Amino acid sequence: MDKLWSENNKEIQKLLTKEATFKEAIQKLLAFREEMFEQITQIVSGYPDEAFAKMPFAGADGYHSKTLAYSIWHIFRIEDIVAHEMIAGDSQIFFTHDFHNRIGAPIITTGNELQGNEIAEFSEKLNIKELYLYVKAVKESTDQILGDLTYKDLKQKFGGDVKEKLIRSKCVSENENAFWLIDYWCGKDIKGLIQMPFSRHWIMHIEAMRRIKNKLCKIARKGVDPVAYCGFSCNHCFLSEWCGSCRTKYNVCSFATCAEDRICPNVKCCKEKDLDGCYECNELENCNKGFYIPSNDGANAAKAQALYIRKYGKKEFLKVHDRLHEKYDFQKTQEVLGQDYKEGLRILEET
């Protein structure tokens, strides 16, 4: 489990035990959920739809053996059911906003009953954009419910009537891999449900999603030119675990994710000019497109690297990057190459 997330969760659970620190606990919980949800947002906004049905760890023992789509669905179907059927006692977001049809899901359950290739087949049927809108709505609704809780509410337990309600809802499969959830939830008070599923459950599955997307990016980059169009080295980029490079569909570089068509302006320009990269362009020194826009603090560092490639070639560029990382401790090249591309080029040449 992510060490920082684990420590954060432990602190929140500890604060929940005392009335004097209850409000602080809820505030920290909401902030923590926002932090974790941002990871889901980045994954949904950064990767192609095909990524969400892939199982790079199929057959493995663990949550990472699922798909990205299944993981998202599972987290929030459980949350929607628990938050509304049990705690709020009202209707699920899934039904009130017609997300069943909007997402195109063949089931209404948590998905625990699905095994192996069933998970991939299920994932392929989902509309990822609508799925994201659903989970965002669930998250916001749950946050409101959590924010309205009092310390006394934490001890509220759930009787047989709630159990029967859950069974009647058909939102939990009768399959042995799923039906146990009803007894599990009904055996907890609200404080226990805050832990599972509103916090720790998120941690486990979002961590699994990170493993899945890291593997997908690694697979996507296999055999692909590690030098980006703008002149960066994907092998040395601090986003290397998140990004599959701008030469694949798994590009999550900032200028790709910000672009309306998810294509970096530098990539688009190079393709229009039939160039391998900006380093082949005779307008490079004066270029203000994409990564080279003056307001970008990494513009001159990128330009310095592109100029180095033009002068010495890609192989030597990758070697100088190795030496640069041996000599300096940094994440972003602008920390070393500075804000003047001529000075940055000089540093590269002297490294």
Task: List each model region and its residues.
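Short, contiguous alpha-helical
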Residues: 1-10, 54-113, 140-143, 147-148, ...
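Terminal targeting/low-complexity segments that flank the catalytic cores of oxidoreductases
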Residues: 1-39
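Short glycine/proline-rich turn/loop motifs
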Residues: 18-21, 115-125, 180-190
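Alpha-helical packing segments of well-folded alpha/beta enzyme cores
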Residues: 25, 29-43, 78, 124-127, ...
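Short, solvent-exposed segments of well-ordered alpha helices
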Residues: 27, 31, 58-62, 66-69, ...
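Short, contiguous, well-structured surface segments enriched in hydrophobic/aromatic residues
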Residues: 35-46, 50, 175-176, 241, ...
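A generic hydrophobic-segment detector
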Residues: 141-190, 308-351
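Cysteine-centered metal-binding/redox modules
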Residues: 220-351
